[in-house]
Amino acid sequence: MAVIKLKPTTPGQRGTVKVTRDHLHKGAGFAPLLEPQHQKSGRNNNGHITTRHKGGGHKHHYRVVDFKRTKDGIPAKVERIEYDPNRTAHIALVCYADGERRYIIAPRNLEVGATIVSGSEAPIRVGNTLPIRNIPVGSTIHCIELKIGAGAQIARSAGTSATLLAREGIYAQVRMRSGEVRKVHIECRATIGEVANEEHSLRRLGKAGVKRWMGIRPTVRGVVMNPVDHPHGGGEGKTGEGRHAVDPWGNLTKGYRTRNNKRTQSMIVSRRKK
């Protein structure tokens, strides 16, 4: 893949950087794996806003992605790589030897026509899914389960991966891209390699309208609101916050740690780096 910097012929194109999709499938998605997606625009059943900055956007179908990879021992051939509007990663349509087709997260360097397989006896090759107990220490992995059989939850977005550091008893230590080291059960599954579309971070939208296509509405600063609307609001002319920065509900922001999950605290060996 490559990036394209558009010429500044219009204000909207000035500074825009796109990622090429020449290698992706040009047609529609695989119909049996498409589901309708109804937009709620951040409103509840009463029409009240429950999540700000949501609404509008282009209609699109949801692609049903196989995050569990439970068809063990059955080889699958990669038929095509597709764009998925619901996520930053690309997806691959694979056809199993028994004729079933599924979508998976496309790893980097996975080519059309390649063969992948799942299960404890699968070889260590890009795109194959195995229990962590069978993956060599030091391997680069993605689509990692946190609960046995629950499906991948970690390292699913474009260009992400994790590193298997060690195995101790029934747990393995995995280092995330953030620097956090976490314990994962060795029976949880992971896929070899890293997620494709690593150039996604180089993309520049160029104009506000692209955000609206994505269903993201503008964010208004609190200091330009009235006191009734935000703790930072009010004042004559241009005034600052007059206090430490908070969100509309008065909770500290800008670095204040809000994580409070004692249930999984013991699974974190080292917190993420700032």
From Swiss-Prot:
Gene name per UniProt: rplB
Protein name: Large ribosomal subunit protein uL2
Any GO MF annotation of the entry: structural constituent of ribosome
One CC-aspect GO term: large ribosomal subunit
GO biological process: cytoplasmic translation
Keywords assigned by UniProt, alphabetized: Ribonucleoprotein, Ribosomal protein, RNA-binding, rRNA-binding
Source species taxonomy: Bacteria, Pseudomonadati, Pseudomonadota, Betaproteobacteria, Burkholderiales
Residue spans of biased composition, Basic and acidic residues class: 229-246
PANTHER family (UniProt xref): LARGE RIBOSOMAL SUBUNIT PROTEIN UL2M (PTHR13691:SF5), RIBOSOMAL PROTEIN L2 (PTHR13691)
A Pfam family annotated for this UniProt entry: Ribosomal_L2
Oligomeric form and interacting partners: Part of the 50S ribosomal subunit. Forms a bridge to the 30S subunit in the 70S ribosome.
NCBIfam families the record matches: rplB_bact
Protein's organism: Delftia acidovorans (strain DSM 14801 / SPH-1)
SMART domains listed in its UniProt record: Ribosomal_L2 (SM01383), Ribosomal_L2_C (SM01382)
